[in-house]
A protein has these predicted regions:
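C-terminal motif of bacterial Sec signal peptides marking the signal peptidase cleavage site
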Residues: 22-24
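Cyclophilin-like peptidyl-prolyl cis-trans isomerases
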Residues: 26-331
Length: 331
């Protein structure tokens, strides 16, 4: 079989021109995120296919330890919901102020028994509002948007496919691929040579499981509300700050009761029971999370298998599951 994606190709990089649009987030009719002891069990996720092995599952199962990146506890947050736990890896490299804010709020127990006050099928689940006030926010300064970053060649983002930056402004295209196990997009790093600062713009994508900050029409208004996407939402690209990614528990997000508290006072939303910084848990209670290194030979082989199963062409980068291994703590 001809290898479609060599490790050399995976070493490429990419990013995009920051767009700005301000959707009318206060209008609930618009689809934008708005403000207002047994042995430990290991599990590996790499996508499933209706009772059959997912493409590349054999490669994932046999990948050497060197092909996996262990996620430090400092990067992990655990959201406890009425439907189960959601494990999130944060991305301070892309949104340092937002990650710091949500860590601070978790330490202050701000989210305890807040609600998922706006949950839309095929879109996202927004949380952080109060049962009696869906527009509630923490008494914190508003954050400046961290929609994109500027980077040089020392930060690698793989270039796998072309992508429209934002379909609402179909005027520019970028390249899409992976950074550190996150789906990302970027201007081609080759363009850095013609930039005064030697850098290009890059951002994390709104694929399913993206964790981002909710805001009003003001791009610099995020405070404490957040949302988790339940599907790919490309119309939000580069206009909302993505600060994390669900590594386990997306099914709990997708099972949340749907509705909008601001529009239907009879809606009974699910609760956020707690948000925990994994590093604050006793060592014996911390899960071990490993994400396949998306610059490794094993991931290149995995991509090749995924492409071969799809007629020789990679699917949309948002439809490619990044393999994750989780070692749960002993109960």
């Amino acid at each position: 079989m001809t290898a479609l994606f060599s490790s050399a190709r995976l070493a490429g990089s990419v990013a995009a021109i920051a767009l700005f649009i301000a959707p009318a987030c206060a209008d609930a009719a618009q689809e934008t995120a708005q403000d207002s002891a047994p042995e430990p069990q290991a599990q590996t996720t790499a996508g499933t296919t209706a009772g059959t092995a997912a493409p590349g599952s054999d490669i994932v199962a046999s990948a050497p330890d060197s092909a996996w990146r262990t996620v430090s506890a400092e990067r992990l947050m655990l959201i406890e919901t009425t439907n189960g736990e959601v494990l999130i890896e944060t991305a301070p490299e892309f949104a340092p102020a937002h990650v710091a804010r949500f860590r601070e709020l978790a330490e202050e127990d701000f989210f305890d028994f807040k609600v998922w006050h706006r949950v839309i099928d095929g879109f996202m689940a927004q949380g952080g509002g109060a049962l009696d006030n869906p527009n509630a926010n923490a008494d914190k300064p508003a954050l400046e948007g961290e929609f994109t970053i500027r980077r040089d060649a020392s930060m690698t983002i793989t270039e796998l496919q072309d992508r429209t930056i934002n379909p609402r402004e179909n005027r520019s295209r970028a390249r899409a691929g992976f950074w550190n196990g996150f789906q990302a997009a970027t201007q081609p790093i080759a363009q850095a040579a013609i930039r005064a600062d030697g850098q290009v713009e890059s951002w994390l994508l709104h694929c399913e499981g993206a964790v981002a900050a909710a805001r009003t029409q003001d791009p610099n208004s995020a405070r404490s509300q957040f949302y988790i996407t339940r599907a790919e939402t490309p119309h939000l690209e580069t206009t909302y700050t993505v600060w994390g990614k669900v590594r386990d528990g997306q099914e709990a997000v997708n099972a949340l009761e749907e509705g909008a508290l601001a529009q239907d006072r009879n809606f009974s939303p699910d609760f956020i029971e707690d948000v925990v910084l994994v590093e604050t848990l006793p060592a014996e209670d911390q899960p071990t999370v490993e994400v396949m290194d998306t610059s490794s030979d094993a991931f290149a082989a995995y991509l090749d298998a995924v492409a071969q199963a799809d007629g020789g062409t990679l699917p949309n980068v948002c439809d490619i599951d990044v393999p994750v291994r989780i070692q749960e703590p002993a109960q």
